[in-house]
Amino acid sequence: MPVSDFQVVLGLEVHAQLLTRSKIFCACPTEFGGAPNTHVCPVCLGLPGALPALNAAVVEMAIRTGLALGCEIQRRSVFARKNYFYPDLPKGYQISQYELPICSGGGVDIAVGGEARRIRLTRIHMEEDAGKNVHDVTAAGSGVDLNRAGVPLLEIVSEPDLRSIDEAIAYLKSLRAILMALGVNDGNLQEGSFRCDANVSVMPRGATRLGTRCELKNMNSFRFLRQAIDYEVRRQVELIESGGKVDQETRLFDPDRGETRSMRSKEEAHDYRYFPEPDLPPVLVDEALVERIRRELPELPRARSARYQRDLGLSAQDAELLVSDKGIGDFFDATLAAYGASPDAAKRIANLLNGDVARLANELSLEPAAWRIAPAQLAAILRLQDAQTIGGPGAKQVVEEVFRSGAEPAEVVREKGLAQVSDEGALEAAVDRVLAASAGEVERYRGGNKKLLGFFVGQVMKETRGKGNPAVVNALLKRKLGG
């Protein structure tokens, strides 16, 4: 049976680091990138006698996330010890939640191929992050950096409702956009503040019994997620087809080889010997707190996209791209306010943000907060076009230069000599040269092939190095060609 005869079944576990200033059970800072083992204390290090104290901001962020995702907020939840040994876990256990998580149920809405679906959530729970093993730092071997130990996490667990890689990526992008809009997570996959484990299984199409699942780790980009799941699905199908059996295990994705490899046998809950954390009381949530947080919820990506489509006439595709990152949506709103709101302006700004600006941001790996171009500058570029100071090709060059340097658009136009030529006398000479060099095309145009006008315009634009005003060039050509 080919792969297409099997149904892929996916469930995702997302670990989202919360944007708190201090860790979940102590006052150590959560900043990324400090020197190894400098953001630590006896609690982080798991020293005997050090007692945890819950950060109230973590609870509020968990409730905010649960409300945004339609979860039931549990009025009483309990922390538990998850016992396992690993060098980056100094206590020998992780403080997490098990039987009584803070949120249950809920879901994430996705759309793939024009079909809308709601992917159910099992639970959301609070837990502490582990440290980090650092390899190749000394000739003697590896080291352990515990700066990350105790950083607060939300683990968001989906039901096995996903049926394709495209659905899995759509789910992650939608969830990431929601968490960023809520201000609880920065969505950074590369730094590991938004990371995902995938439970992958296959079953023959038409079957009702789920196959044995494998958990995949080490996927810090959407591209790696696609590669890892695709490889794992093919591996499982080939194993089943050859008469083998899929073992329940944890597998690590190797991005250099594009394949997964066995890491360890998959543990069940009883292997972790969960029991209630004796050093922390139950988390009690009252109705007043929940209602306050509900009132303070910001506009979520789905509502923002609907507003852009309804009020500004944007296409669903443009709107979804703008709301995929809160920073991009905020930049769009600020540019629209600086330029003047109208459906035409919204479309032009969306085209720039989803086109040239997105390309540059990807090329330079920059998040919106690090862009050197400002909304007022993007609005100024549009006004330069309105005044016919620059044309489309010139605007593209100005956007790139301002994005890279932060220089003012008018200054870039002046220094780079990008001002559009609208003087008929200057353009007429270029038009005459093009027509003289294209006698055959001129004859065919006058014989009825009017589509050649675009060819002539293109040749004149080449002659003027993209600076000719297209409207003036068109008028001159039509006059000289006889309509």
Swiss-Prot record:
GO terms of biological process kind: glutaminyl-tRNAGln biosynthesis via transamidation; translation
Keyword Protein biosynthesis: yes
Broadest EC class assigned to this enzyme: ligase
Annotated catalysed reactions: L-glutamyl-tRNA(Gln) + L-glutamine + ATP + H2O = L-glutaminyl-tRNA(Gln) + L-glutamate + ADP + phosphate + H(+); L-aspartyl-tRNA(Asn) + L-glutamine + ATP + H2O = L-asparaginyl-tRNA(Asn) + L-glutamate + ADP + phosphate + 2 H(+)
E.C. numbers: 6.3.5.-
A molecular-function term among this protein's GO annotations: glutaminyl-tRNA synthase (glutamine-hydrolyzing) activity
Family annotation (PROSITE patterns): GATB
Keyword tags: ATP-binding, Ligase, Nucleotide-binding, Protein biosynthesis
Gene3D superfamilies in UniProt: 1.10.10.410, GatB domain, N-terminal subdomain (1.10.150.380)
Superkingdom to which the source organism belongs: Bacteria
Family: Belongs to the GatB/GatE family. GatB subfamily.
NCBIfam families, sorted: gatB, PRK05477.1-2, PRK05477.1-4
Subunit structure: Heterotrimer of A, B and C subunits.
Function, as annotated: Allows the formation of correctly charged Asn-tRNA(Asn) or Gln-tRNA(Gln) through the transamidation of misacylated Asp-tRNA(Asn) or Glu-tRNA(Gln) in organisms which lack either or both of asparaginyl-tRNA or glutaminyl-tRNA synthetases. The reaction takes place in the presence of glutamine and ATP through an activated phospho-Asp-tRNA(Asn) or phospho-Glu-tRNA(Gln).
Protein name per its UniProtKB record: Aspartyl/glutamyl-tRNA(Asn/Gln) amidotransferase subunit B
Species annotation: Anaeromyxobacter sp. (strain Fw109-5)
